């Protein structure tokens, strides 16, 4: 009788029922650094407006680049929200990488970064030879990326040349250096291929609301080092034409 009563009167929350039938960990892809940088170039990989600005130091960028080139285990996954519902009343406004310009249009299937902005920005800055990384070089003597404080030496290659979207930039650079022969050229092309083909696991969710994205963001990105609510609010002001970072933080 007790078992019959349980089956007849025990109610299970409908949201719980739906949750146990969904496994979000199955929705993943592997994308290379080059794939991801090309998506940023094409505007199909963007940043939600609530994300704070880039916070990594140059040394952190060097550590990432060295791990991608020399590391023996994969780096943690990048997490994105796939925007299928592009209705302006639902979709969170997006900004571009580096300059954080508000994107006027969204396309169905666009990737919005929830976790991984710092890593993606570092790789993209190298891909487009951004001035921020001009003094980061691959030092062939020490066998790693370093920050140079003097003129670039003959056995060093700027990361923005090595990882440049145009492979011809690397070839021209090597040909201009008297001490670099064909063997060095072959090695550098191999190193370039290694780092641009480095694959990240990309975890994907679809059409998360802003609140759901922020919850995911906080779980992934703020554990142990919370980003303040005011930082998120400052970031969101960009949608209304007020860029708090460029207008006030450099005074």
PLM ranges: what are they?
Residues 1-17:
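Intrinsically disordered, low-structural-confidence terminal and linker regions
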Residues 13-35, 41-55, 65-251:
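Basic- and aromatic-enriched surface patches that contact anionic nucleotides/nucleic acids
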């Amino acid at each position: 009788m007790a078992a019959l009563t349980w089956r007849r009167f025990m109610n299970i929350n409908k949201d719980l029922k739906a949750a146990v039938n969904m496994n979000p960990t199955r929705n993943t892809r592997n994308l290379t650094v080059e794939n991801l940088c090309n998506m940023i170039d094409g505007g199909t990989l963007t940043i939600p407006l609530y994300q704070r600005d880039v916070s990594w130091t140059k040394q952190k960028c060097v550590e990432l680049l060295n791990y991608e080139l020399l590391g023996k285990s994969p780096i943690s996954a990048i997490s994105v929200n796939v925007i299928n519902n592009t209705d302006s009343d639902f979709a969170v406004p997006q900004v571009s990488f580096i300059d954080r310009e508000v994107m006027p249009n969204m396309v169905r299937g666009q990737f919005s970064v929830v976790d991984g902005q710092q890593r993606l920005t570092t790789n993209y800055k190298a891909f487009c030879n951004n001035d921020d990384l001009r003094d980061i070089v691959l030092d062939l003597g020490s066998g790693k990326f370093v920050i140079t404080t003097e003129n670039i030496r003959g056995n060093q290659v700027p990361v923005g040349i090595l990882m440049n979207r145009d492979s011809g930039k690397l070839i021209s650079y090597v040909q201009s250096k008297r001490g670099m022969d064909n063997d060095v050229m072959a090695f550098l092309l191999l190193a370039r291929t290694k780092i641009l083909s480095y694959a990240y696991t990309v975890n994907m969710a679809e059409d998360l609301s802003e609140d759901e994205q922020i919850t995911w963001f906080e779980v992934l990105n703020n554990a142990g080092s919370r980003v303040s609510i005011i930082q998120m609010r400052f970031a969101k002001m960009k949608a209304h034409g007020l860029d708090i970072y460029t207008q006030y933080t450099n005074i």
